[in-house]
């Protein structure tokens, strides 16, 4: 039924009346208290959320707390006024004087707002309406309080942003709450911000090394029509424009290999991958990965490149080729020198050492099943000897490795995109790098034979058809590219996070 203009207006008025009758959104007493302060500031003509660059006619730069402290600690402090902005950590009202402690990254600066310098009204506005967590901008000069604390003596102040929630500076420790409120976590635990800076340093170091070695950085699609490049469960979506089901990429590998076929030369991508699997301390549903491919290289050369990459990143972060190592929690690890050559050992040799007996992919299947049961390793239908060997390796070797170690020559059964080992049947030219019990990355001598690749992807698609949510699908476009001819290639993948 089509409503007339009058009926539409009547409906709108009824909706508005209904909204007005709804109870106010439930807010804490603290938030209600702060909202009243916000309204009072606006009523007095002070905007609680001003736009940047609205500090009047002054052209002086706005300093952070750390910048101001650095100036105040110098031998020759300028006589001129400063403009400093910061978040209020604490407030102390002493009648005609208000002391505000501003905080930035764990460092604090005392601000003195005194009636004789700012005037009665600005002091009253501050005393009655400022709360901890508010961000204020203060203009003033260097001075010292009666107890000789370096201070900014205010001549004027303005709101930069009103905080409607109290910040639990002394009590925000619950891990789940910290994950839910990341902005609050960063405010209360500013050391966490250092992780972002370290991440940036790592990414810059990775790029610098790859660029120096002649790699081309590219971007490949994130929305895929066929999921592949790794064995993992994808996120699924739908594109309305084309009426097609799509998946978020689980790896950029197959697109990067298309570029190698097309003559790109050495190529790499730093980007986000998505896997619809469990989440824990070492696995996130979305994560950043470096993948790189070098024509005419193999897994040995990619291993050497990976060692250079991580050592460069360590140098950028720690100022030396060192890494925090240890089996305990990350906070208890000890930074140790890793500048020497890293250990290289085959999966089967390492597993045999852990078991005290020789085990490999040729070991009797029933013996492997018994070993899996003995060590609490779950085996499900469809697993062959290679898959059991890799599961045993993960439980008995990888989890107990602290020092940087390259474990090489994995079972071919679990490495569908890797080339067969050139001298050992049943194995693939693949390695995993393990540090502190975690896989940090892997590399292959890439499988360039399109006929073998088709067989392996067909096997994977049959597993997918039988309900294996992690199995890859047959990507005909990728296979066509491979059939065009891909040069011998080495490829690596590193988890940046």
Can you say where each PLM-predicted feature lies in the sequence?
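Class II aminoacyl-tRNA synthetase catalytic cores and aaRS-like
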Residues: 1-497
């Amino acid at each position: 039924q089509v409503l007339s203009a009058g009926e539409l207006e009547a409906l709108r008025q009824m909706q508005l009346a209904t909204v007005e009758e709804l109870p106010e959104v439930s807010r804490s007493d603290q938030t209600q208290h702060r909202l009243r302060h916000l309204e009072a500031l606006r009523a007095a003509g002070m905007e609680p959320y001003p736009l940047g660059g609205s500090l009047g006619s002054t052209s002086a730069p706005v300093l952070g707390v750390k910048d101001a402290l650095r100036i105040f600690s110098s031998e020759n402090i300028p006589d001129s006024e400063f403009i400093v902005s910061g978040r209020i950590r604490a407030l102390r009202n002493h009648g005609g004087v208000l002391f505000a402690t501003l905080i930035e990254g764990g460092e604090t600066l005392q601000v003195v707002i005194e009636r004789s310098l700012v005037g009665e009204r600005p002091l009253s506005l501050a005393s009655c309406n400022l709360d901890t967590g508010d961000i204020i901008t203060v203009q003033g000069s260097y001075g010292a309080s009666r107890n000789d604390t370096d201070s900014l003596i205010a001549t004027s102040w303005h709101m930069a942003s009103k905080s409607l929630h109290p910040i639990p500076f002394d009590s925000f420790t619950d891990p789940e709450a910290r994950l839910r409120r990341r902005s609050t976590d960063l405010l209360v635990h500013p050391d966490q911000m250092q992780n972002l800076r370290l991440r940036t340093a790592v990414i810059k170091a990775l790029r610098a090394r790859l660029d120096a070695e002649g790699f081309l950085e590219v971007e490949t699609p994130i929305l895929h029509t066929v999921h592949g490049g790794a064995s993992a469960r994808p996120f699924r979506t739908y594109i309305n424009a084309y009426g097609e089901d799509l998946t978020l990429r689980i790896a950029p590998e197959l697109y990067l290999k298309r570029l190698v076929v097309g003559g790109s030369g050495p190529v790499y991508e730093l980007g986000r991958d998505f896997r619809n699997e469990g989440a824990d301390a070492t696995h996130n549903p979305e994560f950043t990965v470096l993948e790189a491919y070098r024509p005419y290289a193999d897994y040995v050369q990619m291993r050497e490149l990976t060692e250079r990459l991580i050592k460069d990143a360590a140098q950028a972060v720690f100022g030396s080729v060192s890494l925090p190592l240890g089996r305990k929690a990350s906070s208890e690890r000890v930074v140790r020198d890793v500048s020497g050559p890293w250990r290289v050992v085959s999966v089967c040799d390492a597993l045999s050492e852990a078991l005290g007996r020789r085990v490999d992919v040729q070991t009797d299947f029933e013996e492997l099943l018994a070993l899996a049961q003995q060590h609490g390793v779950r085996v499900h239908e469809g697993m062959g000897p290679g898959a059991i060997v890799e599961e045993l390796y993960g439980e008995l070797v990888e989890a107990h490795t602290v020092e940087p170690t390259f474990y090489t020559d994995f079972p071919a059964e679990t490495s569908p995109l890797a080339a067969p080992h050139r001298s050992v049947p049943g194995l693939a030219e693949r390695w995993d790098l393990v540090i502190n019990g975690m896989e940090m990355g892997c590399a292959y001598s890439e499988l360039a034979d399109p006929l073998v690749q088709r067989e392996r992807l067909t096997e994977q698609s049959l597993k997918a058809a039988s309900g294996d949510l992690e199995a890859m699908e047959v990507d005909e476009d990728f296979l066509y590219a491979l059939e065009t001819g891909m040069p011998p290639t080495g490829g690596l993948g590193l988890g940046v996070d």
